[in-house]
Amino acid sequence: MAAATGAGRLRRAASALLLRSPRLPARELSAPARLYHKKVVDHYENPRNVGSLDKTSKNVGTGLVGAPACGDVMKLQIQVDEKGKIVDARFKTFGCGSAIASSSLATEWVKGKTVEEALTIKNTDIAKELCLPPVKLHCSMLAEDAIKAALADYKLKQESKKEEPEKQ
């Protein structure tokens, strides 16, 4: 009960501060939304394939990449079936809207592709699809790097699987 009362007081105090501050015209309030293309906003507000897969599984590849310049961190995972087709993909991204949108789009694009086909996905394709401005190209580069890292991890697991002696 005390927590609810405290939260209510906090909400009222915040509202009072907002009401006392000068109001911005609606035109100015909506300006930041125009900085992102509608495709970025869609993937940001409705991200596809958020979550994690079992990284210990032999058929799951995990890529973890980061951009020191902006602090974005992206984890992308793929699940590959016995025929070499990517059947699932998940991501978790700590970053801006463009980084989240790039991750979301990348997981959509890798699904249904073979491991080799997924290697052909380029950051320029992601940037073009999302209409990213030059200042946000590093986000699409992170997505490409995350795909490559996940594929490399998967391939490494497959090689070690072949080297393991068969259990009898």
Curated annotation (Swiss-Prot):
<feature type="modified residue" description="Cysteine persulfide">
    <location>
        <position position="70"/>
    </location>
</feature>
<feature type="binding site">
    <location>
        <position position="72"/>
    </location>
    <ligand>
        <name>Zn(2+)</name>
    </ligand>
</feature>
<dbReference type="GO" id="GO:0008270">
    <property type="term" value="F:zinc ion binding"/>
</dbReference>
<feature type="transit peptide" description="Mitochondrion">
    <location>
        <begin position="1"/>
        <end position="35"/>
    </location>
</feature>
<keyword id="KW-0809">Transit peptide</keyword>
<dbReference type="GO" id="GO:0008198">
    <property type="term" value="F:ferrous iron binding"/>
</dbReference>
<dbReference type="GO" id="GO:1902958">
    <property type="term" value="P:positive regulation of mitochondrial electron transport, NADH to ubiquinone"/>
</dbReference>
<feature type="modified residue" description="Phosphoserine">
    <location>
        <position position="15"/>
    </location>
</feature>
<dbReference type="GO" id="GO:0051536">
    <property type="term" value="F:iron-sulfur cluster binding"/>
</dbReference>
<protein>
    <recommendedName>
        <fullName>Iron-sulfur cluster assembly enzyme ISCU</fullName>
    </recommendedName>
</protein>
<dbReference type="GO" id="GO:1904439">
    <property type="term" value="P:negative regulation of iron ion import across plasma membrane"/>
</dbReference>
<feature type="active site" description="Cysteine persulfide intermediate">
    <location>
        <position position="139"/>
    </location>
</feature>
<dbReference type="GO" id="GO:0044572">
    <property type="term" value="P:[4Fe-4S] cluster assembly"/>
</dbReference>
<feature type="binding site">
    <location>
        <position position="139"/>
    </location>
    <ligand>
        <name>Zn(2+)</name>
    </ligand>
</feature>
<comment type="similarity">
    <text>Belongs to the NifU family.</text>
</comment>
<dbReference type="InterPro" id="IPR002871">
    <property type="entry name" value="NIF_FeS_clus_asmbl_NifU_N"/>
</dbReference>
<keyword id="KW-0496">Mitochondrion</keyword>
<dbReference type="GO" id="GO:0140132">
    <property type="term" value="F:iron-sulfur cluster chaperone activity"/>
</dbReference>
<keyword id="KW-0479">Metal-binding</keyword>
<feature type="active site" description="Cysteine persulfide intermediate">
    <location>
        <position position="70"/>
    </location>
</feature>
<feature type="modified residue" description="Cysteine persulfide">
    <location>
        <position position="139"/>
    </location>
</feature>
<feature type="site" description="Mediates ISCU dimerization and de novo [2Fe-2S] cluster assembly">
    <location>
        <position position="36"/>
    </location>
</feature>
<dbReference type="Pfam" id="PF01592">
    <property type="entry name" value="NifU_N"/>
</dbReference>
<keyword id="KW-0597">Phosphoprotein</keyword>
<dbReference type="GO" id="GO:0044571">
    <property type="term" value="P:[2Fe-2S] cluster assembly"/>
</dbReference>
<dbReference type="GO" id="GO:1990229">
    <property type="term" value="C:iron-sulfur cluster assembly complex"/>
</dbReference>
<keyword id="KW-0408">Iron</keyword>
<dbReference type="GO" id="GO:0042803">
    <property type="term" value="F:protein homodimerization activity"/>
</dbReference>
<dbReference type="GO" id="GO:0005739">
    <property type="term" value="C:mitochondrion"/>
</dbReference>
<comment type="subunit">
    <text>Homodimer; Tyr-36-mediated dimerization of two iron- and sulfide-containing ISCU subunit bind to the cysteine desulfurase complex. Component of the mitochondrial core iron-sulfur cluster (ISC) complex composed of NFS1, LYRM4, NDUFAB1, ISCU, FXN, and FDX2; this complex is a heterohexamer containing two copies of each monomer. Interacts (D-state) with NFS1 (homodimer form); each monomer interacts with the C-terminal regions of each NFS1 monomer.</text>
</comment>
<dbReference type="GO" id="GO:0099128">
    <property type="term" value="C:mitochondrial [2Fe-2S] assembly complex"/>
</dbReference>
<dbReference type="GO" id="GO:0016226">
    <property type="term" value="P:iron-sulfur cluster assembly"/>
</dbReference>
<dbReference type="GO" id="GO:0060090">
    <property type="term" value="F:molecular adaptor activity"/>
</dbReference>
<feature type="binding site">
    <location>
        <position position="96"/>
    </location>
    <ligand>
        <name>Zn(2+)</name>
    </ligand>
</feature>
<keyword id="KW-0862">Zinc</keyword>
<dbReference type="InterPro" id="IPR011339">
    <property type="entry name" value="ISCU"/>
</dbReference>
<comment type="function">
    <text>Mitochondrial scaffold protein, of the core iron-sulfur cluster (ISC) assembly complex, that provides the structural architecture on which the [2Fe-2S] clusters are assembled. The core iron-sulfur cluster (ISC) assembly complex is involved in the de novo synthesis of a [2Fe-2S] cluster, the first step of the mitochondrial iron-sulfur protein biogenesis. This process is initiated by the cysteine desulfurase complex (NFS1:LYRM4:NDUFAB1) that produces persulfide which is delivered on the scaffold protein ISCU in a FXN-dependent manner.</text>
</comment>
<dbReference type="GO" id="GO:0006879">
    <property type="term" value="P:intracellular iron ion homeostasis"/>
</dbReference>
